[in-house]
Amino acid sequence: MRTVLSGRTKEVIIDTEGPVIIIGESINPTRRKKLVETLQENNFDYVLELAESQIRAGADVLDVNVGYPGVDDVKLLPETVIAIMNKFDVPLCLDSPNPKAIEAALKASSGKCLINSLNGKETSLQALLPVAKEYGAAFIGLCMDDDGITNDPEKRVAIAEKIIERAVKAGIKAEDVIIDPLAMAVSAEPQACNITLETIRLIRKKLGHNITLGASNISFGLPGRESLNAAFMAMAVCSGVTCPIANPEKITSIVRSADLVLGRDDFAVRFVEYFQSRT
């Protein structure tokens, strides 16, 4: 299955047969004091620095989140989107819990964006499915619903099926639904990674959709996060993840290696290009 996103002119194809597409996570105020300070001043220079560094490091799509306490994201998210799109021809992933901010950003954007995110809750489906349909956007569907997050992989897949069915019923193409099986902290739930990996395998087998996840979530609260994230990322890609949301400076080498091992990089062209560009 192929999900097509686009910037002003550039298309990015997320394909279940690979290669892996990286969604850069760094434009997010969480733990980024400088980003909060510059956004408060309506200064987008640092946003553009983060965009450029991620693209250079291997990001194909950029996640854009401007959420911090007291922010007017209905105003700031579209302004940030315009600033990025004026300088870079790259597809954007619009990241906000506020449906009005998502809609405002979609109005301001060029190309085809990815909404981050919907879930199986009725309020979420009713608020955002019409928006995705109206603006022709793809979206990420989280495997959680009104009952919360289950540890049963089969139930997570059932939630994914529900989201896809509702999207299709709303007139959205099935291929424009990317599923997030949810990666949770292994420090809090010892089987968290196994649950996520099994959910990924089931989604790939039963539904055949593209799959994303927040790659660094599993290591929260632990030392050696980079090593743990790297191990999990390789396993997740082998299980069926096609477009992780992550720091490209940390995971591009892992993703290029996994694609090569899985036979998705003929004659190691992308692998060699990446490592030669780093020297």
Across the structure, where does each feature detected by a protein language model lie?
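Domain-level signal for soluble alpha/beta catalytic cores
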Residues: 1-178, 184-279
